[in-house]
């Protein structure tokens, strides 16, 4: 069970429409709560002009870093913001360790064009070799080299187990095979 006095990364859901004016990640940021939502670039049209903006890559997924006692009243007050619950456990929300989450956020922010994968999208054919990054913004990271058919870009796979994975571009000069 989670101790109530420690800030933790909670996995949460936002059930609002995709075009909502104030999605949960913006609402929680306004409340000065630390939120991470995996984002992607999207080209849309507003008033006849094409506009490039960032939108969540998985619409209902967000990671919130705070105390459970701070989040519980918000979840009770706003029915579209919910915890994701662990299966076969009674009222225990999903969490991600601080170390894993910080590693994931750092990897995503180091790449201009991260490519997100759901666990079921990763096939054994995509996973090549174990690598370590030596130098650059991702220095010290270890993981799997991801190959996508037809792409010359080298990507390191950084995972949040059972939730999400991201392939971040890596300069070949920083790659060391393990």
What are the roles of these predicted feature ranges?
Residues 133-142:
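Short coil-to-beta-strand transition motifs
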Residues 2-130, 146-147, 152-155, 159-177:
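Acidic-enriched and Gly/Ser
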């Amino acid at each position: 069970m989670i101790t109530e006095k420690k800030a933790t990364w909670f996995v949460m859901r936002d059930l609002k429409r995709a075009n909502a004016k104030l999605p949960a990640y913006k609402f929680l940021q306004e409340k000065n709560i630390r939120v991470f939502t995996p984002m992607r670039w999207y080209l849309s049209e507003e008033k006849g002009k094409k506009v490039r903006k960032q939108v969540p890559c998985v619409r209902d997924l967000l990671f919130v870093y705070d105390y459970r006692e701070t989040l519980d009243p918000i979840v009770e007050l706003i029915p579209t913001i919910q915890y994701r619950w662990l299966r076969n456990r009674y009222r225990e929300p999903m969490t991600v360790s601080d170390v894993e989450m910080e590693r994931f956020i750092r990897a995503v922010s180091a790449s201009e064009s991260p490519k997100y994968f759901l666990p079921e999208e990763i096939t054994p054919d995509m996973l090549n070799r174990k690598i370590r990054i030596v130098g650059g913004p991702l220095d010290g990271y270890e993981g799997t080299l991801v190959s996508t058919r037809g792409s010359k870009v080298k990507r390191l796979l950084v995972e949040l187990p059972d939730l999400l994975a991201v392939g971040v571009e890596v300069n070949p000069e920083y790659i060391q095979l393990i």
